[in-house]
């Protein structure tokens, strides 16, 4: 979802996804849009012999990963020295359960029921612990709030539902 906007802004983009179906749809859409994006059907764990990157965007992925420790370790290996990794996910809180699962999946039907497993959500300090273990230094933690009326996201100090951590590889 983020690859095309980043390419439109002039970034050299490699987009990866473990789902072949998602990659094929993304390739077709980027060709129709005239965007040059390198899409790869894989996961970070399998990309270790690949090139390294200045920036890695892990947006709304970590809460779907079975082995967060291995995932973060693999992403860290793909990051250049002094590179930045942005990791956005859902906090494991009562508020996130109500808004992200009951609200978004069951009431509003924005997502298929069962998309999220609340037990896989990470509290900010848990995610920070995984990042620190891999020598990634937290630069910023911000909440993200969605306004359903204007369909826009904005930065917030509220970490109770969605949040993003920017970390630096030193």
Predicted region positions:
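Hydrophobic adenine-recognition pocket in adenosine-nucleotide-binding enzymes
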Residues: 61
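Class I SAM-dependent methyltransferase SAM/SAH-binding core
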Residues: 1-46, 70
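Acceptor-substrate binding/catalytic loop of class I
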Residues: 89, 108-126
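A short glycine-rich, Lys/Arg-flanked "PGG" loop and its adjoining helix->strand segment in the class I
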Residues: 69-84
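Conserved class I S-adenosyl-L-methionine
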Residues: 84-109
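Core SAM-dependent methyltransferase catalytic element
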Residues: 151-170
């Amino acid at each position: 979802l983020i690859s095309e906007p980043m390419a439109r802004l002039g970034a050299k983009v490699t987009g990866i996804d473990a789902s072949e179906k998602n990659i094929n749809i993304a390739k077709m859409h980027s060709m129709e849009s005239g965007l040059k994006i390198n899409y790869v059907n894989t996961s970070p764990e399998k990309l270790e012999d690949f090139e390294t990157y200045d920036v890695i965007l892990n947006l709304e992925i970590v809460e779907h990963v079975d082995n967060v420790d291995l995932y973060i370790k693999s992403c860290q290996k793909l990051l250049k020295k002094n590179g930045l990794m942005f990791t956005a996910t859902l906090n494991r809180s009562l508020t996130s359960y109500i808004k992200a699962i009951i609200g978004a999946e069951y009431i509003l039907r924005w997502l298929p029921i069962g998309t999220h497993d609340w037990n896989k959500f990470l509290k900010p300090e848990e995610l920070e612990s995984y990042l620190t273990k891999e020598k990634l230094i937290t630069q910023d933690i911000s909440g993200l709030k969605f306004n359903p009326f204007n369909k826009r996201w904005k930065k917030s100090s509220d970490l109770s539902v969605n949040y993003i951590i920017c970390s630096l590889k030193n």
